[in-house]
Amino acid sequence: MFTLFFRKTLTCWVFGFISFWSLTALAAEYSGPLFDAHLHYNTEAWNGQTGPHPVPDVLARMQRSGVKAIVSNSRPNDGTIALAQARAETAAASVTVVPFVRLYRNRSDYDTWFRDPTIYDMVLAELALGTPVGPYRGIGEFHLYDSANANGAVAKKLMALAEEKQLVVLAHVDDAAIDLLMAHTASKGQKLRLIWAHTGIGGAPVKRVEALMVKYPGLMGELSYRPGLTCDRGDLCPEWRELILKYPGRFLIGSDTWINQRWQTYEDIMRGYRIWLGGLPPAVAKKVAWDNGAALFGLN
């Protein structure tokens, strides 16, 4: 009788420990720094500091989320300048601003930038001016809703310019447009550094994503809004986990604060990343969360 009681007690203790360990493992989130590689500070968010999300508000959200650096690109570029000017505030929040020239002065530019010569002139003017934190480090985000527009005259000139000036490109495009854009550079995409916003928001298959990464060594995948990325409990789906483990130096995370609702849920967005990052080996998680972005822009 005592032996039976002892076995039952031991069994309960063992299963209890396993259950506790499992819950603890599930709850373990990545706790290190984050690099937000896709952030917008658009006019509706700040509106000359009278909008719902002035600089102190957005910096507080970044600080609460453990975000230590951002790629800032805004419509118009005044939003990025506002963040860059707030040097004391960003220093207090321990946030580094990496400024990009966005191609949009207003919403109508989304559909015409690739053929509008005034956009190219605007980019050149912004690059000449720079920002309070130094030169612009990249161009974008821009959108191509039809991949054929990657062959627009201005799109061609901007890709060549980006490679020539060693600027990083942030592009919201499909997989066909990646090939077209890369073809417009002198190196045919072998030297251009391009952040693929959403890593193909249209749902390019994982094998196609991998093929493009093999083809273009400077292609980085940013993972906001990526269809099929996460499965149960917010963990990575198996094929994406496998791809990230295979190419740990090629992925980035981002908030994509394109509307104010994304600012209102900023902490939740970043927590979602911490959940699935916690399921990766620690060194890989840190690469995706911070190291890759920091290395891309020389912040290490």
Regions found by a protein language model. Give the residues of each.
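Mid-to-C-terminal alpha-helical segments outside catalytic/metal-binding sites
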Residues: F2, R7, A28-A37, A45-P76, ...
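Acidic/histidine-rich helix-loop elements
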Residues: L39-P54, D109-P117, C231
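Bacterial N-terminal signal peptides
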Residues: T9-S22
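Catalytic pocket-lining loop regions of alpha/beta-barrel enzymes
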Residues: N149-I253
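Active-site gating/metal-coordination segments in enzymes
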Residues: E29, I81-L170, M220, P227-G228
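Alpha-helical scaffolding within the catalytic cores
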Residues: H53-V58, N77-A88, Y120-L127, A177-H184, ...
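Sec/Tat signal peptide C-region and signal peptidase I cleavage site
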Residues: L23-A27
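Hydrophobic faces of well-ordered beta-strands that scaffold small-molecule active sites
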Residues: F35-L39, I70-S72, V97-R102, G138-G140, ...
